[in-house]
Structures are given as structure tokens and as C-alpha cells.
């Protein structure tokens, strides 16, 4: 099995399923995590080209997770429905995408960050 190139961290099940489908239909290999604890475990076990993290998680902070992923060499995208409340400096460290997002907007950002799926193999 090919190693996943994207880690998607989203606590809301419907949003997670939709985003995962958009990414896999576009040819990306995706791992998912619904909590910060699961995300940390996945980050310890594998390297990802891109980590997409929801900012507000029930057990942690998606920005903190994105910071850790970036320190390991991953590109990062923070998604949030609370753009005006993001901590100062977040946009200088991570790409930001407002929720809800259109599939084509998500894919445009992902392609800009890591290229197409064939570019990752």
C-alpha cells in the first residue's frame, strides 16, 4: 500500500468524509484523524507531504498540530469557519482556507502546495 501523502484532521464526520472523498477522487492518498490525539499518533508514525488541520478540535488545537507537522517538513493548511478569530501570526506560518469550502478551491490549494498526485510518487 502506498504511503498517504495527506493527513486530514477534521472532527466533524460529514465534513471529514466529504473532504476525504474530494481528495481521493482527485487521486491523492489520504489518512484521516478525527481528534488531536489520533493526529499526533499518525504524525509520529508517518511523514506527510501535506497536513490539513481543522483549527478547533474537541481535544486540541489544529494550529498547534500544524506547527508540529511543519517542523517535520510537511506543508500545512489550516481550515476554519472562524477566520476572524485566528491567532495573530497563523497566516504567516500556514496556508488558511475558510470553511465551508468548495471542492475546487480545496484542490487548487492542495495542488499549489504539493502538486498533483502523480507528482508525489
Spans of features found by a protein language model:
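Acidic, metal-coordinating helix/loop segments flanking the phosphotransfer/catalytic sites
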Residues: 7, 32-50
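Conserved acidic carboxylate
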Residues: 10
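Two-component/phosphorelay signaling modules centered on CheY-like receiver
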Residues: 13-31
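Acidic catalytic/metal-coordinating carboxylates
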Residues: 35, 61-64
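Active-site residues of response regulator receiver
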Residues: 54
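The feature encodes the CheY-like receiver
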Residues: 58
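Hydrophobic/aromatic residues positioned on beta-strands within the core alpha/beta folds
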Residues: 79-80
